Amino acid sequence: MLDDFKIDLLVKNKPPTSTTAVVAMSGGVDSSVAAALLHKLGYKVIGITLQLYNNNKNSNTKGACCGSLDTKDAKQVASSMGFPHYTLNYEKVFREEVIEDFIDTYTQGKTPIPCIKCNQVIKFRDLLNATKSLGADVLVTGHYIRKIEQDDDIYVYSSKDTKKDQSYFLFATTVEQLRLLRFPLGNFHKEDIRKLAKYFNLQVANKPDSQNICFVTDTYKKTIAELRPHTIKKGNIIDINGNILSQHNGIVNFTIGQRKGIGISSKAPLYVIKLNPDTNEVTVGPKSALLQNKLYIREINWLAKEKIPHNGLNVKVKLRSSHSGSPATIFPNNNNTATILLQDSYCTVTPGQACVIYDHDRMLGGGWIC
């Protein structure tokens, strides 16, 4: 069975028995298999699970991750395989840098992706520092993404399992972080990972994939109302000409492109076109007013060695994780920003989301949509 799951050495020219690998264990099947596989291959595995919020509150939320039951699952996997496991409490920094950012972004009329922020400031910053302090050689995760090192250059590619590819969520990972990160599952398919979990007799073998944001116990609005109630205020819903159509109970209830749940009867479908936090107004209109072929991104993390030429670079862009990608041209601007011009399509542009840039299946970098 293990002959079908060959991976490159985690550290070049260093045998597994001399290599210490910290594995970030969420309690799910992917990170559990990554840890178990490396342990079976002879690596010195240390499992670490991060406690990021009040686990008891969300422990039984269907489809959520990182709850107290997930921590127990991770510990059980480590115990059954015979490698050490530790839980690190990062609740304070998670609240300050992920949850507060999530609320800030929503109240600004944007749509956040807290999982990317968590990867950026918790897993691939603080957990990497913990990895170094333990004297470990690498930090391993169960993400479906491929990384190739040639000489001193690093290339990142989408997973062979395109349905499970997670490169979109890792665009903000820096080159220096990537030097210590390893993704052993990137060349495999999810169904094969579940088979391996059963081969190892892991109790998480049939555990469903997490789909919800870990700290959201019900709805986004309810979470924001609990943590920052004063930010939810009534306001006007207007059309594209500024005419008042109705009232809303807070712009946090809306996202650009939304059609359902607007609460207005109309002969033609209405979509959320704009959210204005300054006036607390929600603008709605026809789909034609929603579609764009130009967008701007900020805080670009560029992984490719080649710079973006001033006359533009033809690329493929993904504007959401489920997006298959659209051909586009990227033009560099000042202050680590860029303009993206879609070549043959119009789409919904949602501020706060990520725009991730590819050359075929190679991830070049990305940025946040303005």
UniProtKB/Swiss-Prot annotation:
It is an enzyme of class 2 (transferase). The record marks H143, Q353 as: Interaction with tRNA. Keywords: ATP-binding, Cytoplasm, Disulfide bond, Nucleotide-binding, RNA-binding, Transferase, tRNA processing, tRNA-binding. Pfam families: tRNA_Me_trans, tRNA_Me_trans_C, tRNA_Me_trans_M. Disulfide bonds join C118-C214. ATP binds at A24, M25, S26, G27, G28, V29, D30, S31, L50, G142. It is found in: Cytoplasm. Its main location: cytoplasm. GO terms for molecular function: ATP binding; tRNA binding; tRNA-uridine 2-sulfurtransferase activity. One of its GO terms (biological process) is tRNA wobble position uridine thiolation. GO terms for cellular component: cytoplasm. CDD domains: MnmA_TRMU-like. Residues 164-166 are annotated as: Interaction with tRNA. It catalyses: S-sulfanyl-L-cysteinyl-[protein] + uridine(34) in tRNA + AH2 + ATP = 2-thiouridine(34) in tRNA + L-cysteinyl-[protein] + A + AMP + diphosphate + H(+). It comes from the Bacteria. Its EC number is 2.8.1.13. The active site is at C118, C214. Belongs to the MnmA/TRMU family. Catalyzes the 2-thiolation of uridine at the wobble position (U34) of tRNA, leading to the formation of s(2)U34. This is tRNA-specific 2-thiouridylase MnmA. It comes from Ehrlichia ruminantium (strain Gardel).
